[in-house]
Amino acid sequence: MKTNTTSPQKIAILGAGAWGSTLALLAQAQGHRVQVWDRRKDLDLKEVLQGSQILISAVSMAGVRPVAEVVRQVGIPPQVILVSATKGLDPLQLLTPAQIWGAAFPNQPLVVLSGPNLSAEIRQGLPAAAVVASRDLWAAVQVQHALASERFRLYTSSDPLGVELGGILKNVIAIAVGVCDALHLGTNARAALVTRGLAEMIRVGSRLGARPETFNGLSGLGDLLATCHSPLSRNYQVGYGLGQGRPLSQVLAEIEGTAEGVYTAPVVVKIAAQHNIRVPITQEVHRLLQGQTTPTAALARLMERQLTSE
């Protein structure tokens, strides 16, 4: 059963990884004509983009800038809606994926798609929900109606930065929770990590211009809970492996796809230093990823910090 209220469209998806492939299935199920472009394969990008009404970027963070530049060189009509579905931060300019796309296409309708969306569950037909956020409400509604179904519910938001940062920042906290579970520290410790992790996300997001209340929604708390409570989460898997005492290189080699939190942590630490934001959990995750501490030492530092109000 189709629940979208838009006529069939052509949707181009950049990135053939787990998330890009899942989005393609969702769009095809709604009767749209979908073409997926993978930069590792010999596909004509111009042909993929031609006639598309919606362009979804689901490439890894490392691929966002080069792919955006290739698309800019090919060119797209001004009415094409750009959708950013990547969760990461640019390590050089400290930008979000949507900010990179926005800089490359300043006059294009731009939408952020984010939420608690584990690809494997969606591909199994299990129900899920997400948020499409944009300063252009019309664009957000177009994407909402194009992709929503009886198994994939979409909400709109006018806070694209908050929606995007929620999906980005929770990846680092998920690594911490994975470590916690590997050390068998219990439910109390896990609850404390998730709750204080959300507080860190809100501090960073609000300082950067996002609305604090956005982080209490699907793209913030919702995504945080899904990522921290599922062994399907790559970031959780990284933390669990580190908590078992395995080297990061080995853990990453055994994971399918990209654990963006590994590359997000140092960027968040840099942003926090620039803006004087307290991010103790993220700092300990960063030290652990750099091999500068052990899981037990990181825990001790978190527990022995100066006492303060919540």
Curated annotation (Swiss-Prot):
Gene Ontology terms describing biological process: carbohydrate metabolic process; glycerol-3-phosphate biosynthetic process; glycerol-3-phosphate catabolic process; glycerophospholipid metabolic process; phospholipid biosynthetic process
Subcellular location, in the record's words? Cytoplasm
Keywords from UniProt, A to Z, are:
Cytoplasm, Lipid biosynthesis, Lipid metabolism, NAD, NADP, Nucleotide-binding, Oxidoreductase, Phospholipid biosynthesis, Phospholipid metabolism
Q: What GO molecular functions are on record for this protein?
A: glycerol-3-phosphate dehydrogenase [NAD(P)+] activity; NAD binding
Q: In which pathway does it act?
A: Membrane lipid metabolism; glycerophospholipid metabolism
Xref: InterPro entries: 6-PGluconate_DH-like_C_sf, 6PGD_dom2, G3P_DH_NAD-dep, G3P_DH_NAD-dep_C, G3P_DH_NAD-dep_N, NAD(P)-bd_dom_sf
Where, by residue number, is the active site?
K170
Gene Ontology cellular-component terms for this entry are: cytosol
| Record's catalysed reaction(s) | sn-glycerol 3-phosphate + NAD(+) = dihydroxyacetone phosphate + NADH + H(+); sn-glycerol 3-phosphate + NADP(+) = dihydroxyacetone phosphate + NADPH + H(+)
Q: Which SUPFAM superfamilies match?
A: 6-phosphogluconate dehydrogenase C-terminal domain-like, NAD(P)-binding Rossmann-fold domains
Q: Which PROSITE patterns match?
A: NAD_G3PDH
Top-tier EC class: oxidoreductase
* Chain positions recorded as NADPH binding sites: W19, R39, R40, K87, S119, R234, E260
Q: Which NCBIfam families match?
A: PRK00094.1-2, PRK00094.1-4, PRK14619.1
What is the annotated role of this protein in its UniProt record? Catalyzes the reduction of the glycolytic intermediate dihydroxyacetone phosphate (DHAP) to sn-glycerol 3-phosphate (G3P), the key precursor for phospholipid synthesis.
Q: Which family does it belong to?
A: Belongs to the NAD-dependent glycerol-3-phosphate dehydrogenase family.
Return the HAMAP family for the record: NAD_Glyc3P_dehydrog (MF_00394)
By what name is this protein known? Glycerol-3-phosphate dehydrogenase [NAD(P)+]
